[in-house]
Amino acid sequence: MRKNKLFVFLLALILSISSLSTIAFGYSITSASEDSELNWYFVNRGKDTLPECPKEATGLLSKYDAYYLGDTNEKVIYLTFDEGYENGYTPKILDVLRDEKVPAAFFVVKPYIVDNPEIIKRMADEGHLVCNHSNHHPSMASITDPEKFKAEFTDVEEVYKEIVGSDMPKFFRPPM
């Protein structure tokens, strides 16, 4: 069973990496103003060394009662996927997740939902979280019109509800 879970994780990791054009690690903040765009990444500090929360982020985390690291004694992996387009891998990934009883979270954009309603239904039916990744995948900090900003969330939620018949889970992964 352990080897199977490792296989699922490695398969997902390989598929995720193969679909990325660049991978960046680090954290940056341009300024402390309210309209600054924050970039949030992982900084690898070496083997057996926990990542450190960037000093610039500690106030933000405290303000929203959020955390950077969970219980480090607990061995938990959160498996997440960004679904912006479909290359035929998702049904295969869902098969493995189902067979191994591994839950995952899929962050989807509106066009993905519209183009793949059966896959979306299957994700939800099999107990996975299907979460919001925006309508058009913009840099959210660049949207100055409040209605356009709101629509990036609500347009996705509405089409999800039409297809699945229930509200979309309230998790959002901002596009970078």
Predicted regions and their residues:
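Helix-enriched interaction subdomains in cytosolic or periplasmic regions
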Residues: 31-50
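Active-site microenvironments of hydrolase-like enzyme catalytic domains
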Residues: 176
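N-terminal Sec-pathway targeting helices
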Residues: 1-12
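Cleavable N-terminal signal peptides
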Residues: 12-13, 24
